Structure formats: structure tokens, C-alpha cells
């Protein structure tokens, strides 16, 4: 079974249908008409992951149709992914198929790329990885000029680093982000820059007021917006994202951001003085004069009180 080709020419119609669907959900709220920013139709996604399906002596990338979850869909090209990922896929697969130490019990391959050309590949196995695998993987990383991580149950081998570095251009500035394997990043890099630019335009400058951001991730919006506020108070629950955020603040030389590792429910409780937290012992919540709240919530949404 193979995947159907992407209909690039139909993208504008698909986008319009999606916009109308979303608008209909919020029709009772009397919101202004949405502003629509089209994406590239191909090569827009900076992350991709595939099962590696073994068929006799050959392995290939595979995905699964929810309607037929036991039947692998062979993926030879994936134009949805960034061109760097799409170009790398056959080169990497050829290397994997040519060396048993790489292909043996390999069941998943994950790609993380950036607009600025960095690439991280995670190879995930159903076996313990040894020194032989590490030596071959180091050669592979050098030949393909990529970062490689090997994973198996309770094992993670980082050959060099477990992150990529993005240099994101927004409104004439360049923002630097470490993006860690396993951490959330915006998958559409070009549209991410557009979203940040749009957010900056909406808030204007409020240098005498403060920003509250819920679920800030690695500082994707936090860093560009911090220049337009006196202070920023941000929350995040992922350890990986909090670590990346602190490192990204340093890389971008911003010092007016306080990140709290807590949920929106907990922060709301603290702001309402319903509960105290040791994590807030060093933070004077009363010193914040919040003018704007930014939230990109998790899929579960926000709690009612927040």
C-alpha cells in the first residue's frame, strides 16, 4: 500500500474550508473576521517521524492509515517535510539498509530540522545499543553532516548533542533557539515567524506593563515579546522546555523573564491567593502589572478557573 500524492494545487481551497470550519465553531462569540496566513504547500514541516518496516532484507519508512492500522503505508518521499528532511530520507535509508548494525531491530526514525540548516535524527531500537553501533553511527553522522541519537528501552546515546539550533528571522531580527529532542517546537518554521510577528504587532509596546504567558515552551514567543514589556511572567510544565527556555534567554540576552514550572491551575490559585507554593518563594506576584495574557494551551485546553 502506498500513500496518495499531495494535491498542491488544491491547498488554497483546503485552507479556505478550514478557515470556514474554525469560524463556524466561534460564530456565537461575535469575534472579528480571522486574518488568514497561508503556509507553503510543501516542504513546510520541520519535524517528522516514521516507523521503519522490515520486509525480508529491506527496510523502508512507513506510516499507518487509522482505517487500516495494521497495514504499513510505504513512504519513499515526504514532501510535507522540510526539503532537508525529504532529501535526507533516502540517503539515510540507504545507509541503514547497507549495514546490519544500523538496521537490526530499528523500528522508528525521527527527524528534527531547522530553517537554518541544523538536523537531528533519532534512531529508536528494540535492542540494547553497544560500542559497535556507536562507532558506525558516528561515521554515519559525519558522512551525512547530521546529529544522531540512539535510543532503546532505558537507554539514550547522544553522539554529540541532543538538540538543534534554530536562527529564526522575525521583522529584521534573528532569534536563537535551542530545540531539544522530545521537546515541543512549532513544526512550521516559516509560519512560526509569521505568528510571532503578528503577536508583536498586536501588543505594540507596553514598557510600563507586564506580560503573562501560560505554557511558554522553549520561549518561542516569550523572547521576542519580552522586548515590548517591562517584565514577563511565564509558566511551563515540561522540564525539557523549561531548561531550553532558560538557555534561550541567555542566548538572546534577555533578562526580564521569570519562568515558573507550574500549571495554569496552580498559577491561578497563587494569583488568587488561594494557595502558596515553594516554587514561588522568590517571586513577588504582586509586583507584576499584567497588561496582556498570551496562551497557546495544551491539547487538553485550560481549566475553567484560568
Predicted features and spans:
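Short acidic/polar mixed-charge low-complexity motifs
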Residues: 57, 69-71, 117, 171-175, ...
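Extended interfacial segments that mediate partner engagement and assembly in macromolecular machines
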Residues: 2-106, 115
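Short hydrophobic/aromatic beta-strand micro-patches
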Residues: 51-53, 112, 122-126
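Nucleotide donor/acceptor-binding cores
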Residues: 46, 119, 209
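A short interface-forming secondary-structure element
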Residues: 78, 121-131
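Rossmann-like S-adenosyl-L-methionine
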Residues: 128-306
Amino acid at each position: 500500500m502506498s500513500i496518495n500524492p499531495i494535491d498542491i494545487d488544491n491547498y488554497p481551497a483546503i485552507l479556505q474550508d478550514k478557515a470556514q470550519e474554525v469560524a463556524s465553531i466561534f460564530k456565537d462569540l461575535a469575534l472579528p473576521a480571522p486574518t488568514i496566513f497561508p503556509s507553503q504547500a510543501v516542504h513546510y514541516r520541520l519535524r517528522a517521524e516514521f516507523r521503519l518496516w522490515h520486509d525480508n532484507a529491506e527496510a523502508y519508512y512507513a506510516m499507518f492509515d487509522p482505517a487500516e492500522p495494521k497495514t504499513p503505508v510505504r513512504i519513499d518521499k515526504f514532501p510535507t517535510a522540510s526539503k532537508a528532511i525529504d532529501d535526507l530520507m533516502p540517503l539515510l535509508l540507504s545507509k541503514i539498509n547497507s549495514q546490519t548494525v544500523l538496521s537490526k531491530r530499528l523500528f522508528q526514525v525521527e527527524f528534527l530540522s531547522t530553517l537554518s540548516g541544523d538536523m537531528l535524527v533519532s534512531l529508536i531500537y528494540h535492542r540494547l545499543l553497544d560500542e559497535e553501533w556507536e562507532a558506525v553511527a558516528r561515521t554515519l553522522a559525519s558522512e551525512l553532516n547530521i546529529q544522531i541519537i540512539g535510543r532503546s528501552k532505558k537507554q539514550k546515546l547522544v553522539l554529540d548533542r541532543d538538540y538543534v539550533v534554530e536562527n529564526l528571522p522575525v521583522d529584521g531580527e534573528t532569534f536563537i533557539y535551542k530545540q531539544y529532542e522530545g521537546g515541543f517546537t512549532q513544526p512550521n518554521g516559516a509560519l512560526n515567524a509569521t505568528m510571532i510577528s503578528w503577536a508583536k504587532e498586536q501588543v505594540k509596546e507596553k514598557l510600563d506593563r507586564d506580560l503573562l504567558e501560560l505554557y511558554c515552551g522553549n520561549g518561542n514567543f516569550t523572547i521576542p515579546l519580552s522586548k515590548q514589556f517591562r517584565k514577563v511572567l511565564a509558566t511551563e510544565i515540561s522540564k525539557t522546555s523549561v531548561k531550553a527556555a532558560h538557555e534561550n534567554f541567555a542566548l538572546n540576552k534577555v533578562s526580564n523573564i521569570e519562568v515558573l514550572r507550574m500549571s495554569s491551575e496552580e498559577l491561578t490559585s497563587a494569583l488568587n491567593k488561594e494557595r502558596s507554593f515553594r516554587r514561588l518563594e522568590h517571586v513577588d506576584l504582586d509586583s507584576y502589572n499584567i497588561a496582556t495574557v498570551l496562551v497557546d494551551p495544551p491539547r487538553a485546553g485550560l481549566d475553567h478557573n484560568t
